[in-house]
Regions:
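Generic recognition of stable, solvent-exposed alpha-helical segments in well-folded globular domains
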Residues: 34-41, 83, 93-100, 132, ...
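Acidic-enriched catalytic cores of C-N bond-cleaving enzymes acting on peptides and small amides
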Residues: 35-65, 88-123, 133-166
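Structural helix-boundary/capping segments
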Residues: 1-85, 99, 103-107, 146, ...
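Glycine-rich, small-residue loops and helix-cap segments
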Residues: 124, 177-321
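Sec/Tat-exported extracytoplasmic proteins
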Residues: 18, 46-50, 85, 109, ...
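A short beta-alpha structural unit
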Residues: 86, 121-130, 164, 234-235, ...
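Short helix-loop capping/hinge segments that flank enzyme active sites or metal/cofactor-binding pockets
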Residues: 70-84, 134-209, 267-275
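Hydrophobic alpha-helical scaffolding
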Residues: 29-32, 74, 87-95, 127-135, ...
């Protein structure tokens, strides 16, 4: 809900060296910018094998040197796009914006077909994600903290203690998220990467997720699958609404994490109260170039992005659009 373009790349395409870990099985860097062109240009200087991150070895020989070369305003003409209907039907305004975007794709020459994700995957994806993330966080965050300067926490227990102090006396204007503190406790006490459940999920569950999603793309002969990046409109900034909203909805974005496959977000429109809605283009491993082409064509066909009204140019500045 930011009103700009962004890419969650194929896992291993970009180095994670120096990034605070949440779960290295899912973590990745990714560029964000006003337009798809800017995101593609940023990728040119971000890709490459990094000796400090062994995951990038998977990208050797598979990354491109100029992602802007893929940008084509006519890329939707002849493309075959799947729309994941499982993530629509939770917010009328979001649905309307996405349907308008699908109409724009059709008008640009794309064939748009409905697809459905396997029911077991929709039911199990949260458990898969939590099983991996909760068990990886403690050892990985502590390995990261060990390299910091003196004065910083060294263990998850120390992080929890500092979090409690912040929660007891929040900074002025701050709204602490109690769910984050609760997750610290769960991540402290929920197994390790050595236990059988983690090994089962990591060795068998994640490859199964990836195989099913790649199979969905292949079986329907798709260039990409699209869905609302968030099936419901954004909440009010600075107001914590708890772990469940009045109209809870599933999210497709964690499937990109579970599978390690790329997800390009492009502005799709705005709600009646001017909040941004994004559309995700999901594809095969190392298909970033094709996703950039499709996302750029969609961006040029719709031209819906607006500059933020609360951050105008400062005196003497000119914002390049």
């Amino acid at each position: 809900a930011n009103g700009f373009a962004g890419l969650k790349p194929t896992h291993g395409l970009l180095s994670r060296d120096g990034i605070v870990p949440l779960a290295l099985s899912f973590d990745t860097a990714g560029p964000m910018a006003r337009h798809v062109y800017d995101v593609a240009a940023m990728m040119n200087v971000m890709v490459g094998v990094d000796p400090a991150d062994e995951a990038t070895l998977a990208s050797e020989g598979r990354y491109d040197t100029d992602y802007t070369a893929f940008l084509d305003a006519d890329a939707l003409d002849g493309a075959r796009i799947g729309v994941a209907r499982d993530f629509l039907g939770y917010d009328d305004e979001v649905d309307w914006i996405i349907e308008a975007g699908l109409d724009a794709m059709r008008a640009a020459g794309a064939t748009v077909v409905d697809v459905r994700y396997p029911a077991w995957l929709l039911e199990a994806k949260a458990q898969y994600y939590q099983t991996i993330r909760w068990r990886e966080f403690k050892p990985q965050i502590e390995a990261y903290l060990a390299d910091l300067a003196p004065g910083y926490p060294r263990t998850l227990e120390e992080m929890i203690e500092r979090a409690r102090k912040i929660l007891a006396a929040p900074p002025e204007g701050g709204v602490p998220n109690p769910t984050r503190w609760t997750l610290f406790e769960q991540e402290l006490n929920t197994g390790t990467p050595d236990d059988y459940l983690y090994r089962a999920m990591y060795d068998h569950g994640l490859p199964l997720v990836r195989a099913n999603l790649e199979g969905l793309l292949d079986a329907n002969d798709l260039d990409a699958i699209v869905y609302p990046t968030s099936p419901t409109r954004p909440g009010q900034a600075g107001v914590y609404r708890g772990s469940s909203s009045p109209n809870p909805s599933p999210s497709a974005t964690n499937l990109a994490n579970l599978s390690g496959l790329p997800d390009l977000i492009v502005p799709a429109g705005y709600t009646s109260n001017r909040l941004p809605v994004g559309i995700s283009f999901f594809g095969r491993p190392f298909s970033e170039g094709r996703l950039f082409a499709l996302g750029y064509a969609f961006e040029q066909a719709t031209k819906v992005r607006r500059d933020p009204v609360h951050a105008p140019a400062l005196p003497g500045e000119t914002i390049r659009r």
